[in-house]
Amino acid sequence: MKFIDEAKIEVAAGKGGNGATSFRREKFVPRGGPDGGDGGKGGSVWAEADENTNTLVEYRFVKRYQAKNGEKGHGSDRYGAGADDIVLKMPVGTLIRDLDTDEIVADLTYHGQRVCLAKGGKGGLGNIHFKSSVNRAPKQSTPGEEGETRSLQLELKVLADVGLLGMPNAGKSTLITAVSAARPKIANYPFTTLHPNLGVVRIDENHSFVMADIPGLIEGAAEGAGLGHRFLKHLSRTGLLLHVVDLAPFDETVNPAEEALAIINELRKYDEELYGKPRWLVLNKLDMLDEEEARARTAAFLEAVGWDYPEPDDRFQFDMETPRLFQISALTHQGTQELVHQINQYLAEKKRIEAEKAEAEKAAANVEIIEQQPKTDTGVFKPE
């Protein structure tokens, strides 16, 4: 299936059915009272996040979604039937924006989440509602309300904990294959990856995280060169970036340090917030080098890029702010287990810190509410 991560659609809810003007027709009752029923509600249009849907391709072909109108009311106090709602299944991670107001209508972040995109109109009132002591035979009824209509921009940003960043052919697809069940296309030429791939990295029965591989970046990506610029947005929801570098390129004229600096430059030009995300360095393809050459190339690379990556004896004692360096071979799996265990540890600690911060903010808000409550002269809270 073709990977489509953007689409524009129009959604239109149904109109409510008109209320009925009707009177009872009974033998020997010359002036039967009003019995016109209400109209049915118009159908609404909903978006629902579906973990089994991976692309917005369907919305490239069908641009307009129209719910049906409600049925009109009937005599004998019979109400019109309401129209069925339309439910549009969208991938988890879809951002929905109103094209007219630029308002974010919904951010679908979990499976089963439902959001109303266009509300159906209410049914009109039948004349039974207008009977009064001075008007025993009202002829008025009301029309159904119009349903909402919206023009929407759909944008898919994949939900992943970790994002892979690097030049084409750096070995990102091989890495995601080595540590997860994902099976992206792999070949020894640039731009093998043409769309984002997601892999679930399972540490044990209770611990796992999602890794995203996007097409490789090249210089000028922020201005639209290559493929990666279209997919950089998919890294915006990640909590950690892995910058994968080919330490042993087949082309000896390629300078890994220059390529790495170009990647970071493109990242910064594209989005300052994305540039500021925690970023670990992963030097790949160690299987192509002997131990001495790998050490020499690593030292030369770090000196050329000017990045400071400490290497303590116990790597598991890193604090959250320290950048980390890993030397791996995705092909032979050398160093990959240490990498995924540290990622898991980092994400667990990050989650704990965020939970503590949220709890502290909640407690502070509760204190503020209490302090704002009026008190008596004795300091006792005064009831509202």
Swiss-Prot record:
Question: GTP-binding: is it a keyword of this entry?
Answer: yes
Binding of GTP occurs at 166-173, 191-195, 213-216, 284-287, 329-331
Which spans does this entry mark as compositional bias, Polar residues?
130-143
Q: Which SUPFAM superfamilies match?
A: Obg GTP-binding protein N-terminal domain (SSF82051), P-loop containing nucleoside triphosphate hydrolases (SSF52540)
**GO CC term (a single one):** cytoplasm
Top enzyme class? hydrolase
Q: Which UniProt keywords apply?
A: Cytoplasm, GTP-binding, Hydrolase, Magnesium, Metal-binding, Nucleotide-binding
Q: Where is the OBG-type G domain?
A: 160-348
**Compartments where located:** Cytoplasm
Deletion phenotype: Essential, it cannot be deleted.
> What inducers act on this gene?
Expressed constitutively, reaches maximum expression in early log phase and remains constant until stationary phase. Similar levels are seen when cells are grown under iron-limiting conditions, anoxically or in the presence of human serum, which mimic clinical infections (at protein level).
Q: Which cysteines are joined by disulfide bonds?
A: none
Binding, Mg(2+): S173, T193
What Enzyme Commission number(s) apply to this enzyme? 3.6.5.-
Residue limits of the Obg domain? Answer: 1-159
UniProt GO MF annotations: GDP binding; GTP binding; GTPase activity; magnesium ion binding; ribosome binding
Q: Which residues form a coiled coil?
A: none
Q: Where is this region: Disordered?
A: 20-46, 129-149
Which InterPro entries does this entry report, sorted A to Z? G_OBG, GTP-bd, GTP-bd_Obg/CgtA, GTP1-OBG_CS, GTP1_OBG_dom, GTP1_OBG_dom_sf, OBG_GTPase, P-loop_NTPase
Query: How many cofactors are bound and how?
Result: Optimal binding to GTP occurs between 5-10 mM Mg(2+), binding to GDP is inhibited at > 1 mM Mg(2+).
Q: Provide the assembly information.
A: Monomer.
Its annotated function is as follows: An essential GTPase which binds GTP, GDP and possibly (p)ppGpp with moderate affinity, with high nucleotide exchange rates and a fairly low GTP hydrolysis rate; the half-life of the GTP-bound state is about 50 minutes. Plays a role in control of the cell cycle, stress response, ribosome biogenesis and in those bacteria that undergo differentiation, in morphogenesis control.
Question: By its UniProt entry, which PANTHER family does this protein fall under?
Answer: DEVELOPMENTALLY REGULATED GTP-BINDING PROTEIN-RELATED, MITOCHONDRIAL RIBOSOME-ASSOCIATED GTPASE 2
Please identify the protein, giving its name as recorded: GTPase Obg
